[in-house]
C-alpha cells in the first residue's frame, strides 16, 4: 500500500486542500510559508498517535475559517491505495478501513479534532452569537474565546473507513505504521553520540552477532549456529565477570560501607558490591567516533552536514529493525514512512544530489522504507528528483495556496515532458520556487534584464526601481532556447482542464526573428526591411506565432513579448534601433582591427546619422568604403538593394542600416557583448539623467510581471 492522497480541512494554512502522492519518493517544494511542513505534520497527525492532541494548539486551526456558528474542527483524511505485488500484511492492516475497489482497494484513515456533542457544544452555540457584528464574526475575539473556555475540551480521534460511520481505527493496526519525521531543527549530535541514546542503543543491540544470525529468529537458526551464539554469550559473561572482580578488588569498600554500620543501616542487611554485566549494559559505553587517516575524532567535532547524514543512516537502520518480525514479532511495523525536512541542511550541492538519489534508490530497491516525503528549498534536490515525484506548493494569481504536479502538467505531450526532465537543472528548477517567472531566450538577455529594469522606477517616492522590485516580488529570470519555450510553458498552462499545471504569472521575452522562405523551401532569418507582402515572408517567426496562439491566448497567466512586428528583430537589434546615435551600445567586443566592424568605423557611421538622421545613403556609402573582401561586398549589395526598395521613411532606413550592421557585429559574440554592455549601462545609470532608451517591449514585459 501507499499514501495516495490526503485531504486537509481547517488545519493551519489549509482551509480545504487535497494533495496526491506517488508510491515511492515525494519531493515537496515551495516558497517559505507555503505549507510544506504543515503538509507533513498533517500526515503525522493521522499516522502517529503520539503527536495527536498533545501537540495541537488553537493556532493550528486555519485562520481563514469564518463560519463560527458551530465549533471549528480539524479534519485530515488520507487514502491508502493498493500497490502491485504488495506484501500480504498490508491488506490485513487496512482491511477494516477499505472503502472500495477501483479496481484495487482503497482504504481511508481520518483524523478529527473536535468539540464533542453535549453540554459544552450547546453552550458554545449559544454564546458564539454574541461575537457577531453585522452578520460577520469577530475572528480574533472568537479564537480567544475558544482558547479560554473550550479548547481544553476538544478531543482527537482517528477513524477508519467511511468517515460517516465514525468507526474508530483499531489502535493495534495503527501501530503497524512507522512514521519517522526528521525536522529541520534536528540535533543529530545529541541523538547519536553515546550508546545510551535510544536510537543508537537499539541499532547496536539489533546488529549484535548479526554476522551469525543474519537477523533471523532464534527458532529458525540451525543447531550449530545456536551453539556458536551460546558460546559467544557465555564467553562474554565469563570475561565480564573477571573484569568486574578485578575492578572490585581495587575498591576499598570497607571505607565506604563503614558509614552504613555507624548509621545503623547495616541492621537491615550488610551492603556489598555486586554486578552482572551483559551485552546490553556495555552498549551504554560505546560512542560514535570518526576516523580520518588513522586519527580518531569525537562526533561533536564532525561537520554538521555529515552528522545529519549519519543520523539519517541510524534512523533508516532503526526502521529496518522495527519492521523485522524476527526481532519484534507481532509488534513489527508493516509500513515504514520517512519524512525529512530540508535534507539539504549543511550539505554542499553534490552531496544533496547524492543524498536524494540514495534515499530514492532505497525505496526502489525495496528497502525497508516504503514511502518517502522530502520538503526542500533546494534547486539541487529538486533537479535530482524525478519530475513525477515533485509536488509544488505555490500562491496562485488570486493569492490562494495551490498545488501543482509538474510531472502531470504535460498531459499527452511526452516530448515536452522528456525535454523538461532532461534540462530542468538546478538553475532552471528555480522557476518552480519563484512567485513569478520571466523566460528569456539567451544568457545575454538573462544577464542584461536586471540592468534594463533599473532604468525604470517602480516606486519613485521610495526610490525603488524595477530591478529592486524583481527581487522584492521573488521574480526569477530563466534562460531557455527560443524554440523550446513551449516545453517549459507546459508547466504553467493552468486552466480548469489542467489543474496539475502551476498557475504562476509567466512572461516570455523573445525575439521577433522575421524570416523569409528561400527557393529551396527553407525558412531563414532576415531583416525587417527585407520583408515583403508575400507568403514567403513572416514578420514574426512561426515559433513566436505558435507561442502567442498556443499559450498567450488560452492562458491568462502567460504573456509573450517581442520586438515590434515589421521593424524589430532581436534584443541587440532593438538596442541600436532605440539608441542609433549613442556610443553606449559600442563595447570592447567589437573587432579591434582589420575589419569594417571596428569601434572607429562604427562611430563614423553614427556620426553620419547624428549629422543628418535621414541620410541613409551617406551611411551606406561610409560603410561600403570599409569593405575589403568580395564576400563582404556581395552581402552588402543585397542589403543596399533591399533598403532602397523598402517603404520605410528615410530616418527609419538610416536606423535600419545601422541596426543591421550592429547586429552582424555582435551576433556571434552575444554573451561577451552583453557582459561589456551591462558594464557600460551600469555607468550610465550612475548619471543624473541616463541617456540609454529601453526597448518598448522590454518595458511592457516588466510592467506586466510586476503589476
Annotate the PLM regions.
Residues 53-68, 84-220, 412, 524-553:
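Glycine-rich phosphate-binding loops of NTPases
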Residues 48-72, 320-333, 365-369, 373, ...:
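Flexible phosphate/Mg2+-sensing switch loops adjacent to catalytic phosphate-binding sites
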Residues 176, 188-340, 517:
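Extended helical coiled-coil dimerization/tether regions that scaffold
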Residues 85-90, 119-124, 189-193, 381-385, ...:
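Switch/connector loops and helix/strand junctions flanking conserved nucleotide-binding motifs
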Residues 1-48, 281-427, 663-707:
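Switch/communication elements of ASCE P-loop NTPase nucleotide-binding domains
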Amino acid at each position: 500500500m501507499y499514501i495516495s492522497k490526503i485531504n486537509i480541512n481547517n488545519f493551519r494554512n489549509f482551509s480545504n486542500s487535497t494533495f496526491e502522492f506517488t508510491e515511492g519518493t515525494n519531493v515537496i517544494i515551495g516558497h517559505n510559508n507555503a505549507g510544506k511542513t504543515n503538509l507533513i505534520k498533517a500526515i503525522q497527525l493521522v499516522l502517529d498517535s503520539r503527536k495527536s492532541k498533545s501537540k495541537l494548539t488553537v493556532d493550528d486551526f486555519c485562520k481563514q475559517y469564518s463560519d463560527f456558528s458551530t465549533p471549528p474542527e480539524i479534519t485530515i483524511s488520507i487514502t491508502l491505495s493498493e500497490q502491485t505485488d504488495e506484501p500480504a500484511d498490508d491488506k490485513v492492516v487496512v482491511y477494516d478501513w477499505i472503502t472500495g475497489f477501483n479496481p484495487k482497494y482503497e482504504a481511508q484513515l481520518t483524523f478529527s479534532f473536535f468539540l464533542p456533542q453535549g453540554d459544552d457544544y450547546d453552550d458554545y452555540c449559544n454564546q458564539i452569537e454574541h461575537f457577531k457584528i453585522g452578520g460577520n464574526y469577530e475572528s480574533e475575539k472568537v479564537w480567544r474565546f475558544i482558547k479560554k473556555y473550550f479548547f481544553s475540551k476538544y478531543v482527537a480521534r482517528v477513524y477508519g473507513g467511511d468517515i460517516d460511520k465514525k468507526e474508530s481505527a483499531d489502535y493495534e493496526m495503527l501501530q503497524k505504521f512507522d512514521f519517522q519525521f526528521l525536522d529541520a531543527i534536528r540535533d543529530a549530535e545529541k541523538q547519536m553520540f553515546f550508546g545510551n541514546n535510544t536510537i543508537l542503543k537499539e541499532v547496536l543491540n539489533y546488529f549484535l552477532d548479526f554476522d551469525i544470525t543474519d537477523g533471523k529468529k532464534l527458532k529458525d537458526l540451525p543447531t550449530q549456529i545456536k551453539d556458536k551464539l551460546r558460546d559467544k554469550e557465555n564467553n562474554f559473561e565469563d570475561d565480564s565477570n573477571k573484569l568486574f572482580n578485578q575492578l572490585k578488588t581495587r575498591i576499598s569498600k570497607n571505607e565506604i560501607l563503614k558509614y552504613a554500620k555507624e548509621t545503623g543501616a547495616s541492621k537491615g542487611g550488610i551492603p556489598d558490591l555486586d554486578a552482572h554485566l551483559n551485552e546490553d549494559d556495555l552498549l551504554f559505553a560505546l560512542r560514535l567516533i570518526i576516523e580520518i587517516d588513522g586519527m580518531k575524532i569525537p562526533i561533536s567535532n564532525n561537520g554538521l552536514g555529515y552528522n545529519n547524514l549519519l543520523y539519517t543512516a541510524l534512523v533508516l537502520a532503526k526502521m529496518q529493525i522495527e519492521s523485522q518480525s524476527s526481532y519484534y514479532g507481532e509488534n513489527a511495523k508493516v509500513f515504514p514512512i520517512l519524512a525529512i525536512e530540508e535534507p539539504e541542511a549543511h550539505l554542499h550541492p553534490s552531496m544533496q544530489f547524492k543524498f536524494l538519489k540514495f534515499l530514492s534508490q532505497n525505496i526502489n530497491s525495496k528497502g525497508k522504507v516504503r514511502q518517502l516525503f522530502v520538503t526542500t528549498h533546494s534547486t539541487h534536490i529538486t533537479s535530482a528528483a524525478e519530475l513525477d515525484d515533485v509536488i509544488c506548493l505555490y500562491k496562485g494569481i488570486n493569492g490562494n495556496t495551490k498545488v501543482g504536479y509538474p510531472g502531470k502538467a504535460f498531459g499527452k505531450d511526452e516530448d515536452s515532458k522528456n525535454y523538461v526532465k532532461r534540462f530542468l537543472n538546478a538553475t532552471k528548477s528555480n522557476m518552480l520556487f519563484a512567485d513569478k517567472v520571466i523566460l528569456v531566450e539567451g544568457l545575454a538577455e538573462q544577464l542584461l534584464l536586471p540592468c534594463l529594469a533599473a532604468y525604470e522606477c517602480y516606486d519613485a517616492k521610495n526610490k525603488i526601481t524595477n530591478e529592486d522590485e524583481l527581487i522584492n516580488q521573488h521574480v526569477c529570470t530563466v534562460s531557455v532556447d527560443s524554440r523550446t519555450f513551449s516545453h517549459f510553458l507546459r508547466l504553467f498552462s493552468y486552466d480548469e482542464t489542467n489543474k496539475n499545471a502551476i498557475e504562476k504569472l509567466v512572461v516570455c521575452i523573445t525575439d521577433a526573428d522575421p524570416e523569409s522562405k528561400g527557393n529551396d523551401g527553407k525558412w531563414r532569418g532576415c531583416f525587417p526591411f527585407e520583408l515583403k507582402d508575400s507568403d514567403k515572408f513572416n514578420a514574426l517567426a512561426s515559433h513566436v506565432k505558435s507561442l502567442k496562439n498556443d499559450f498567450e491566448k488560452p492562458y491568462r497567466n502567460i504573456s509573450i513579448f517581442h520586438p515590434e512586428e515589421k521593424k524589430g528583430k532581436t534584443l541587440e537589434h532593438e538596442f541600436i534601433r532605440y539608441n542609433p546615435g549613442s556610443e553606449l551600445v559600442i563595447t570592447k567586443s567589437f573587432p579591434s582591427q582589420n575589419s569594417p566592424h571596428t569601434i572607429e568605423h562604427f562611430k563614423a557611421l553614427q556620426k553620419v546619422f547624428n549629422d543628418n538622421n535621414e541620410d541613409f545613403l551617406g551611411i551606406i556609402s561610409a560603410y561600403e568604403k570599409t569593405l575589403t573582401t568580395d564576400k563582404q561586398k556581395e552581402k552588402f549589395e543585397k542589403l543596399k538593394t533591399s533598403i532602397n526598395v523598402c517603404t520605410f521613411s528615410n530616418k527609419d532606413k538610416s536606423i535600419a542600416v545601422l541596426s543591421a550592421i550592429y547586429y552582424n557585429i555582435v551576433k556571434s559574440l552575444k554573451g561577451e557583448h552583453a557582459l561589456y554592455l551591462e558594464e557600460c549601462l551600469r555607468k550610465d545609470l550612475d548619471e543624473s539623467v541616463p541617456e540609454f532608451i529601453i526597448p518598448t517591449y522590454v518595458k511592457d514585459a516588466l510592467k506586466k510581471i510586476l503589476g
